[in-house]
Amino acid sequence: AVLAILLATLLFTSLFTIAISLQTAMQESNMRTTGTSAHAGIKRLSWEEYEKLSSDTGIKDIGYSIIIGNAVGDDFNKTPTELRYGDETYAELTFNMPDTGHLPEQKNEIATSRIVLDAMGLPDKVGTQMELTITTDTDTYTDTFMLCGIWDGDAVAYRQTMLLSKSYTEQVAPVIHGET
């Protein structure tokens, strides 16, 4: 009887462990596919609206990003890549936090995934210079950037991301200039 109780206990413990592990794996897979672990995403907020939201005590973490545009060129035909500015919280919530180096701080610094670097044929080494053409809703820019941060990236994501500095974003992002 004692053996039967032990075996039944082991069986139920194993079943619950497997079920919880499966649920966790499914949640992680969904987050990776959508590109974020955030519970909500709100687009096209003004800065005043963002500040109002961020002061809400019911919100645990809040980050923001500004979409700049898309990387263009043959290197990006099979690896769609968008360029944006994102604060540290945004980078963490979207799995874009560098594990080598740091987020962009200086005007022409850039951070990206090893997937993008492979597509461009560049080494995953901080300090690497890269020329990049960016298309926004209103213009096209070609600039040289210095790689300051690198993360693994995720092949299941619907697009890859390159993060640019706030000062560069303020110079080129159409939304900041009231053009979109």
Segments predicted by a language model, with ranges:
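Short, strongly hydrophobic transmembrane alpha-helices
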Residues: A1-S21, S37
